[in-house]
Design a protein with these regions (language model features):
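C-terminal His-loop and adjacent cap/lid subdomain of alpha/beta-hydrolase
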Residues: 25-366
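Sec/Tat signal peptide C-region and signal peptidase I cleavage site
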Residues: 20-24
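Bacterial N-terminal signal peptides
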Residues: 7-19
Length: 366
């Protein structure tokens, strides 16, 4: 019953369409794996499922006024046609016989490269669903849903079957771009050093500092966000990690004399370089989902595995992914280049009021 309520929420969260965006295209679908899911298990009236893994290759035109919301897009490298290229991993689960499905697509916004829909709706764990155990209770399959995931965040570290996105680095007249980077760090346990991101898991590729000289950066600490911050003197911290008894210089970590206090908020501001055009992650979701929903083939006549199989599409996200959903709708990425709605409904779960911070300069999704 709880699963049916979740599914029903997808239809209730139908949001208004937003202004159209510019030309963009899935130019090539690269299918790397295709085969039976769950050993061909029959999921009730829907029957067996198919598992398709690959990569989508995109192009966008920076000069289109409707792409102006993607920060630094005009500073990205261009191909011979004057377009910006990027790519996104994708993972698709679909009924083997489309006629037995419900003609609905559920797009699950991955969280730091990790798939969450099967965990949420099917009570299943795993980032590379392939077996019957990975289907969990089989709810979404018995109901006939097609499930799609695409990479969108350019800072995700490879490994553990995380979904990646290849986003270009912005350059100004061929030279590296530098700018201020703001990082928040909070640890649950006392540690001597920490990677430069909110969570303690090594999942993000950080923007490298221009210099490891702490006099060119600022590190503050406070017991909670409502309290005033205290600056840590530059000789009492370093860009480094603790290895045993040794302090090793590391551009991706911060070391604090006496260690980081559990639960305290540490804020680091430093000069970083080589910003990714992170807003293209929204274009990847928009154009990837639109392709699977509407198109028959890519530019090279590779067939869309969902061609003529989808009538409605919905987007779902939890926490960081929910913030992405909020931002996607607010910034106008729910209409494709042909002025068609990409998603008919959206469910943003435990996202809070924040956005994804992915269309700002030197963006680093929280």
């Amino acid at each position: 019953m709880a699963k049916l309520l979740w599914c029903g929420c997808l239809g209730l969260f139908c949001w208004a369409l937003v202004p159209p965006w510019g030309f963009a295209e899935v130019v090539r679908v690269e299918i790397r794996e295709r085969g039976a899911f769950a050993d061909g298990c029959e999921f009730g009236r829907t029957g067996p499922y198919e598992r398709i893994v690959g990569r989508l290759h995109f192009e966008v035109r920076p000069e289109d006024a409707c792409n102006a919301g993607i920060t630094d897009l005009k500073l990205a490298p261009r191909n011979a046609a004057g377009r910006v290229e990027f790519w996104s991993d994708f993972f698709l689960l679909k009924p083997l016989d489309p006629a037995r499905g419900n003609r609905r697509l559920l797009y699950d916004v991955n969280n730091r490269g990790n798939k969450l829909a099967l965990w949420t709706f099917n009570e299943a764990r795993g980032n590379n669903p392939a077996t019957l155990a990975d289907a969990g209770n089989g709810f979404l399959m018995r109901e006939g849903w097609s499930l799609l995931w695409c990479g969108w965040s350019g800072d995700v570290m490879p490994g553990d079957d995380r979904l990646l996105a290849g986003l270009p680095v912005a350059r100004e007249n061929g030279k590296p771009i530098t700018g201020k980077i703001h990082v928040e760090i909070c640890r649950d346990e006392p540690v001597a050093s920490s990677p430069l991101y909110w969570t303690p898991w090594a999942l993000s590729v950080v923007y490298p500092p221009v210099s490891l000289d702490t006099r060119r950066a600022t590190l503050t600490m406070r017991p909670k966000r409502s309290e005033p911050a205290t600056e840590i003197p530059p000789d009492q911290w370093a860009f480094a990690r603790q290895e045993g008894d040794q302090r090793v210089p590391d551009a991706g970590s911060v070391w604090v004399q006496g260690g980081l206090r559990p639960g305290w908020l540490y804020e680091l501001v430093y000069e970083g370089q080589d910003p990714r055009v992170s807003g293209l992650g929204f274009a990847a979701v928009r154009d990837g989902a639109s392709f699977f929903r509407y198109e028959k083939t890519d530019r090279h006549e590779t067939a869309n595995p969902l061609a003529n199989a989808i009538e409605r599409a919905y987007i779902f996200g939890i926490s960081q992914s929910g913030r992405f959903v909020n931002h996607l709708v607010y910034d106008g990425f729910n209409t494709d280049e042909r002025q068609r709605a990409v998603f008919d409904g959206a469910l943003s779960h435990v996202s809070g009021p924040a956005a994804a911070c992915s269309t700002t300069g030197s963006a680093w999704p929280p």
